[in-house]
Each structure stands twice: as C-alpha cells, then as structure tokens.
C-alpha cells in the first residue's frame, strides 16, 4: 500500500510543501568581474572547510577573492543562523561561478570604425554544509 499523495489547491501551496531548501546557500549576482577570473579563486576553496577557505582568501593575491569572501561569509552565517549548524563542522559542499549579462561598450578606432569592449559580469554561488565524519565507524 502506498501513501496517499497530498492534494494542493494551488501552485504556491505545492511549492511550500515540496520546497527543498539548500542549507547555507549564498549568491552574489552581477559582480563586475570576469567569470573566468573569479573561477580561479573559487576552484582554490572548493571542498575545503570554511575556516581554511577564509584564511586562504585573506591572503590570496587576486582581486576576485574579496567578493568570494563576502559570499562565503554570507553562506556561513546563513548556515549558522537559519539551519543551526556547528561552525567548526562547516565545509564548502558546492561553489561555482556562472556568467551574468555582458555590458557592451564601443571604443572608437581609426577611420570611423569601432571595437566592442565586453565588460563581463558574474554570479557567484557558494553552498555550505556540515561535514560527515565517517572516520572511526564500524567496518
């Protein structure tokens, strides 16, 4: 016998019931940096503990480390406040950078022509979760 499926009156009720919330998630949108350059920083901290990642970002000589550190701090505080996780067990479960809209600007060139300068933007997403300690378990 299967469990009866709940019936919802409207789309909003269904979203509230079925909503799968990602714990400790933070997104920074429309950051005025190239996604290619921000990915260099995000690749360094992916999979590390939050305290290690904060220390790495503090001393990393890249301008993209500042907005990534802000997003990481926001994700950490979301996990601590909203989901009541323990700070010393937090680890970066997912971190990725998507390309945002590109601003196109014209640069005048010789003989009345022009080149297009693409000012790229990024969307930075960091998801933080608790570490699963599988060490010391039964064999």
From Swiss-Prot:
PANTHER family: CHLOROPLAST 50S RIBOSOMAL PROTEIN L22-RELATED (PTHR13501), LARGE RIBOSOMAL SUBUNIT PROTEIN UL22M (PTHR13501:SF8)
Gene: rplV
Molecular function, one GO term: rRNA binding
Organism: Deinococcus deserti (strain DSM 17065 / CIP 109153 / LMG 22923 / VCD115)
Name used for this protein in its record: Large ribosomal subunit protein uL22
GO biological process: translation
Subunit (UniProt): Part of the 50S ribosomal subunit.
UniProt function note: This protein binds specifically to 23S rRNA; its binding is stimulated by other ribosomal proteins, e.g. L4, L17, and L20. It is important during the early stages of 50S assembly. It makes multiple contacts with different domains of the 23S rRNA in the assembled 50S subunit and ribosome.
InterPro entries according to UniProt: Ribosomal_uL22, Ribosomal_uL22_bac/chlpt-type, Ribosomal_uL22_bac/org-type, Ribosomal_uL22_CS, Ribosomal_uL22_sf
Keyword Amino-acid biosynthesis attributed: no
Keywords linked to the UniProt accession: Ribonucleoprotein, Ribosomal protein, RNA-binding, rRNA-binding
Cytoplasm found in the keyword field: no
Region (Disordered): 1-21
Domain of life where this protein originates: Bacteria
Cellular compartments per GO CC: cytosolic large ribosomal subunit
CDD domains: Ribosomal_L22 (cd00336)
Family: Belongs to the universal ribosomal protein uL22 family.
């Amino acid at each position: 016998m299967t469990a009866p499926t709940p019936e919802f009156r409207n789309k909003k009720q269904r979203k509230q019931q079925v909503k799968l919330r990602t714990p400790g998630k933070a997104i920074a949108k429309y950051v005025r940096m190239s996604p290619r350059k921000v990915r260099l920083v995000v690749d360094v901290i992916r999979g590390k503990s939050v305290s290690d990642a904060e220390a790495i970002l503090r001393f990393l000589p890249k301008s993209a480390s500042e907005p990534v550190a802000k997003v990481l701090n926001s994700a950490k505080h979301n996990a601590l406040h909203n989901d009541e996780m323990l700070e010393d067990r937090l680890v970066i479960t997912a971190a990725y950078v998507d390309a945002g809209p590109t601003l196109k600007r014209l640069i005048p060139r010789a003989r009345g022509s022009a080149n297009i300068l693409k000012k790229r933007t990024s969307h930075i997403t960091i998801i933080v979760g608790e570490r699963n300690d599988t060490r010391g378990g039964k064999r």
